[in-house]
C-alpha cells in the first residue's frame, strides 16, 4: 500500500515492479489512498491493483465495495477468484457506486487542495510534533511521491506534542 496507512510511507512502485519481475513474481499493490486519479500503478509496471471503493469512490458512506484491476497477462487469476469465491455487487450497490463515481474527481481534488492547506498550517503549529503528508518537502517519501504521483492525496496524519493533554 502506498501511501501507507497511517503514516503515509511512500514505496517506489516502479522499483517494486522491477524487483518482482526479476524474481518471476506477480506484483500487487493496494492503491486505495492514492486512487487512480493521482497514481497509476499499471503504468509503473504493477501486475494487479486493488482499490477500495468504499470511501473515496463511494463518497457517501453507504456502500462497501472494492475493485481489482489486472494486466491482460494476469486477468485469469482475478476471473478465477471472482468465479470461485464471489465478489459481485448487488444491483443497488452498483448503482450507488456508479452515482458516486460521477463526482469522484471533483470531491477528491477539492479534498486534496484542503489537505495541502491543512498540512501547511499544521507544519507551523506548536502543538504538533510530527506531520505525515507526502506533499510536504520534509516528508521522507516526498521525492518518490512527486515522481510517481500526480498529486499527494487527501490523508494527513500527525502526532501531538507530548506536552499536550488530548483530553
What are these regions (language model features)?
Residues 2-127, 132, 143:
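Conserved PLP-enzyme active-site core in the AAT-like
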Amino acid at each position: 500500500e502506498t501511501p501507507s496507512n497511517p503514516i503515509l510511507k511512500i514505496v517506489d512502485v516502479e522499483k517494486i515492479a522491477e524487483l518482482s519481475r526479476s524474481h518471476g513474481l506477480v506484483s500487487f499493490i493496494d492503491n486505495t489512498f492514492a486512487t487512480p486519479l493521482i497514481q497509476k500503478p499499471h503504468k509503473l509496471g504493477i501486475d494487479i491493483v486493488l482499490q477500495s471503493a468504499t470511501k473515496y469512490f463511494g463518497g457517501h458512506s453507504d456502500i462497501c465495495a472494492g475493485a481489482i484491476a489486472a494486466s491482460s497477462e494476469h486477468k485469469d487469476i482475478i476471473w478465477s477468484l471472482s468465479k470461485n469465491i464471489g465478489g459481485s455487487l448487488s444491483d443497488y450497490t452498483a448503482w450507488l457506486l456508479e452515482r458516486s463515481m460521477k463526482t469522484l474527481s471533483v470531491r477528491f481534488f477539492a479534498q486534496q487542495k484542503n489537505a495541502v492547506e491543512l498540512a501547511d498550517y499544521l507544519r507551523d503549529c506548536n502543538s504538533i510534533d510530527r506531520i505525515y503528508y507526502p506533499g510536504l518537502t520534509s516528508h521522507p517519501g516526498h521525492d518518490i511521491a512527486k515522481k510517481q504521483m500526480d498529486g499527494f492525496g487527501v490523508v494527513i496524519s500527525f502526532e501531538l506534542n507530548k506536552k499536550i493533554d488530548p483530553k
